[in-house]
């Protein structure tokens, strides 16, 4: 993802209010930091089949209502409904012989223990489709704020380094913007790999390998050389 924060400072020297048409340098400087993944993300789903489309819809609704009711015991976990779909089943003569319905539930939390307990309960009637780890929004934003300062300092140092090469005694900042990037999410681990068994009491105590993500902020700007 990227965000732009334009910086258009007033000229430090009143005599430099002329048109910017020469002595311009455009370059970038970055700052990166490795951050621990502090958020667990999981997706569970339910698939039902029935000859009646209304019965399929009823079973899906019952499943989601049951899941949401259980999730209320874990306020530390944010729960949202995902994709839902109902589609017909056909025989060889293209005649509808039944219906299939699917629905998914998305979970995310910075409380790994609470999330794993909830996942264990939900797995008694839903399937764990996937689980991964990422940097939470709060941690990411805090880190990006730190890196904006560091990237700015790196930009200033780079500008100073370039002055002698161009025979300049100083520079004036013309514009500057920041972009954020990086690998925020650890590789996805699917249910068959994670093996979060619903009946196992060890689920809540499982030591997850959340891993790290690297966050990078780049300062890209233009300066005018002062001779």
Model regions and ranges:
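Short, charge-dense linear interaction motifs
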Residues: 1-227
């Amino acid at each position: 993802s990227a965000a732009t924060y334009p910086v258009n400072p007033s000229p430090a020297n009143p005599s430099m209010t002329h048109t910017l048409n020469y002595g311009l340098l455009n370059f970038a400087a970055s700052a990166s930091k490795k951050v621990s993944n502090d958020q667990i993300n999981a997706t569970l789903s339910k698939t039902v089949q029935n000859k009646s489309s209304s019965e399929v819809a009823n079973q899906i609704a019952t499943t989601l209502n049951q899941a949401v009711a259980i999730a209320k015991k874990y306020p530390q976990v944010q729960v949202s409904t995902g994709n839902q779909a109902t589609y017909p089943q056909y025989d060889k003569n293209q005649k509808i012989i039944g219906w299939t319905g699917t629905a998914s539930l998305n979970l995310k939390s910075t409380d790994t223990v609470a999330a794993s307990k909830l996942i264990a309960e939900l797995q008694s009637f839903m399937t764990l489709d996937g689980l991964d780890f990422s940097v939470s929004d709060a941690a990411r934003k805090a880190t990006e704020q730190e890196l904006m300062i560091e990237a700015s300092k790196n930009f200033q140092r780079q500008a100073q380094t370039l002055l002698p090469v161009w025979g300049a005694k100083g520079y004036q900042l013309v514009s500057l913007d920041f972009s954020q990037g990086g690998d925020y999410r650890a590789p996805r681990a699917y249910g068959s790999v994670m093996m979060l068994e619903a009946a196992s009491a060890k689920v809540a105590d499982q030591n997850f390998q959340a891993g790290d993500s690297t966050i990078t902020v780049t300062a890209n700007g233009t300066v005018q050389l002062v001779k």
